[in-house]
Amino acid sequence: MRRLTVVQLLPALDAGGVERSTLEIAEALVDAGHRAVVVSAGGRLLPRLEALGAEHRALDIGRKSPLVLRHVRTLRTLFREVDADIVHARSRLPAWLGWWALRGMGGKRPHFITTAHGLNSPSRYSAIMARGERVVCVSRTVRDHLLAHYPATDPSRLVVIPRGIDPAAFPRMPHPDRAARARIAGMHPQLEGEGPLLLLPGRGTRLKGHTDAIALLAALRGAGTDARLWMPGMVQAGREAYVRELVEMTRRASIEDAVAMTE
């Protein structure tokens, strides 16, 4: 088996499905004997990435500024330095930078792959996610979205690989873990109780369905069920206005003492 070098491009390594998928692919590559290189601005998941045996190159390729164009040459140099076989872009701006870097390489160039993790607003800027030699779509909905808005895309290049979870990290239990519930309630008193605990992990974006979860909780509590709602991952820099909006929604529904929004 020939050892491959795969370079993944993304803005940062803080939290979210893109970041988790990046770590999972890096781990799979290393376990299979390949070389995994990740380019990002870094973040709290960086120690976990490096513990997997992957390499990280710090480069702020997600900052929306004209100055980011200077990273095209840096990426081109990096691709040559590591002798990249595959460049895998997971976000729009990093994808554009990687695309431009590859276009300036003479001779044999690395293959260019993208993963469309969501339903980006249709535009020339977003179209880069459909330009990969192979485009990984995390759902059939994402595949249909790309084909509908970028009809020139060859459907044979799109591959649906649904996102999933590691069952070892999220094991099924025959009954609720009361000790775990008590620990969580100790950190977030709003979650204390014996009733159902609703969990909605995800970044603070409207696509995640936070308002629907709050409406569901309000209906359950209105029907007499002592349900609680935990939304981890949504409290992030730049999401403050959205969080305030949701807090106000819980207040209007008189359920603010049964909801925890956390990092």
Regions found by a protein language model. Give the residues of each.
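N-terminal strand-loop element at the rim of the active site
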Residues: 8-73, 157, 234
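A conserved, positively charged/aromatic
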Residues: 79, 103-140, 151-152
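Short His-centered aromatic/hydrophobic patch
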Residues: 88-95, 116
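Carbohydrate-associated surface elements
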Residues: 141, 164
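Nucleotide-activated donor-binding/catalytic signature segment of Leloir-type glycosyltransferases, i.e.
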Residues: 243-263
